[in-house]
Amino acid sequence: MKPYTSIRPWALLLALTAITPACSRWEGEVVESQYQAPLVPDPTYTFQRQGTSSVDLLLPQQAASASETLYSRFLRTAYILNATRWQELKQLFAQGGNNEIALEPLIATSAQQSKYRTAILSDFAQILDDVRRAAGYDGDTYATERYNRRASAGQTGFIGYNQGDNDRFFVTTDGFAPSELYRGMTLGAVYLDKALGEYLDEKFLTDKALRQAHEAPQLVPGHSYTALEHTWDLAYGYYLQAQKLLQSNSLTGLRGSETKLFNAFALGRLAITEYRYEEALSHLRSIRTLLAQAVAARALEELVGRNTLANLNERPEDAFRFISRGVGYLYALQFTRRPSGEPYLSHEEVKSLIASLKAGEGLWDSSLRGRLDKVARSLSSTFALSLPTRL
């Protein structure tokens, strides 16, 4: 008697048929796999504890509001026509008011800047003074003729066309627009110094007491976050304010860096939430590199980018606004950090580069193009970036 089997001949044939195509396909035929890797959702910066958000970004938002109020109410229009208006500007900067916090106490507060804070505060005081003098309020007197005159080499005044035009701006005797310098200086001395110098510091992620309090969890009184979480969140909040000033439609050299930075912040926060501190440290170092390159790229774009060079070729003074912005971003580079935590450029190195652009008649000088190129090459080398595409 034959042994019993549960596999009938037709079933065996069907099984072999199913296997055969994998072994006998036409030469050159492409076989598409039906396997698809699981989709990994993009990271989000949304974290909760017991149904309540554990992310508090209020302080960075207040700092940005104070800075923007100073710029829009006083600096952009440079309409400081009397002592009352001048005192109002200085008081708002130093003490706050009108529902705005003071900006001055936030400037260069990290331990890395303690040596230079006095000099940096002096730079900001000079910018405010330059704004009033550029618009005709010199000494204790305001002169309408100074406010309404066109700027020229060695003479303050406006560049642009009619009064009230958005493109009209005021410059000092060397052609620099202090209002545009101010925005880049704030980017560095407040947003970058807070994010990179104060809060994104290895000492927080390696501190045993902070780790233990975080894992307990021991929450900050009155809030739903731990001290370690809030430290990272504050860095993220100041980055968001910096990112607004770094955005540019014409900046193509670092496409994707904004997404990489956001992902690094979000994944770093997630790593902290899950006690993966070494991974958080890795994201911290990536953020330092990416953010430094973003600031340097924006500086290069404003100093020697297409818009700047096109204006230099046609009507040079129209480029002064772009160059002034670029010098502001150049100033901010002293607050960037290498992956190791060391600065890319020192305070002295940055001031030296800026001084080279102010030599002679400043932006009015016939040698400006060559000096811009020299500064650009230096930044390109330091930050491993390509120079902007020329016309």
What residues fall within each predicted segment?
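Bacterial N-terminal signal peptides that target proteins for export
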Residues: 2-11
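C-terminal motif of bacterial Sec signal peptides marking the signal peptidase cleavage site
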Residues: 19-22
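Mature extracytoplasmic or organellar-lumen-exposed domains after removal of signal/transit peptides
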Residues: 28-391
